[in-house]
A protein has these predicted regions:
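Amphipathic, heptad-repeat alpha-helical segments
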Residues: 21-77
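Active-site machinery of serine-nucleophile hydrolases
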Residues: 158-227, 258
């Protein structure tokens, strides 16, 4: 019995030492995350590239016009181009349905660009599901986030809205395209009355750490700039991986939240 106990102790001591060996850093043996996506039919590739070129031209047109208001809202358009372009280039459409999402996302981006060129930005005062974007101070990339704006919210009103940040769970196939499409079509399970719900993307599924952590803070600041927010009523919430993120933000930034609900 004593020998078995000693052997068990030795194995327990050895296992952590070998848990992160050289093989864990070999890209040929470590499981790819995310997995390689499906092959995209040539017809879809052609159509998506044509749409990307059209949207890129419209973005350039807004930039050339030099209107400061339009320029400040351009990230709300650029997120659609970046998502589809990157996911197409890196083969990050994981099911045939993702390809259809890309077509929808691209169409929305083109429509927004058309509105912005015409001097309009109706999504900025829209209630319900709204997808917005900001330029990261870390690497100057455009990053998306989703909002659920309550029907009672008025941009020109006097009252300020509570904001709940909802951290999404782990999803190895949650590309930017899928996230943007989801946030434009699904409110999620948590929509408290009179509350703006902020859904950060957080750079895929890194538990909202590293650049994902900074993205959350920047997304919140962007919301404060564009919406009437009650800064005394901002909370963090989440489930699964999002619950871990909630704990992290509750501990690291305890003075910022009136509640934390992992």
């Amino acid at each position: 019995m004593m020998r078995l106990l000693c052997l068990g102790t030795v194995l327990l001591l050895i296992s952590p030492l070998s848990a992160d060996g050289p093989r864990d850093n070999d890209p040929t043996t470590v499981r790819r995350v995310p997995r390689l996506g499906v092959d995209v039919p040539e017809e879809d590739v052609t159509k998506l590239n044509k749409g990307l070129d059209e949207l890129a031209g419209m973005i350039q047109r807004v930039q050339q016009q030099g209107d400061q208001q339009a320029m400040s809202l351009l990230p709300d358009v650029m997120i659609y181009h970046r998502a589809v372009k990157d996911n197409l280039e890196h083969q990050e459409f994981f099911a045939p349905g993702d390809i259809q999402k890309a077509h929808r996302v691209l169409a929305t981006g083109i429509e927004r660009a058309r509105q912005l060129i015409g001097g309009h930005a109706p999504w900025t005062s829209q209630t319900g599901l709204v997808v917005r974007g900001f330029i990261s101070r870390l690497d100057q990339t455009v990053q998306p986030y989703g909002l659920v704006v309550p029907p009672t919210y008025r941009a020109d009103g006097e009252s300020r809205a509570r904001v709940d940040i909802w951290f999404h769970g782990r999803g190895e196939t949650l590309s930017e395209t899928s996230f943007i499409d989801q946030r434009g079509r699904q409110a999620g399970q948590y929509t408290p009355a009179g509350t703006i719900v902020l859904h950060p993307y957080g750079r895929y599924s890194n538990a909202f750490k590293f650049a994902g952590e900074v993205d959350v803070l920047e997304a919140l600041e962007h919301v404060k700039q564009h919406y009437r927010v009650d800064e005394q009523r901002i909370s963090v919430r989440g489930f699964s991986m999002g619950g871990a993120a909630c704990w992290q933000f509750a501990v690291h930034y305890a003075d910022r939240w009136f509640a934390a609900n992992p």
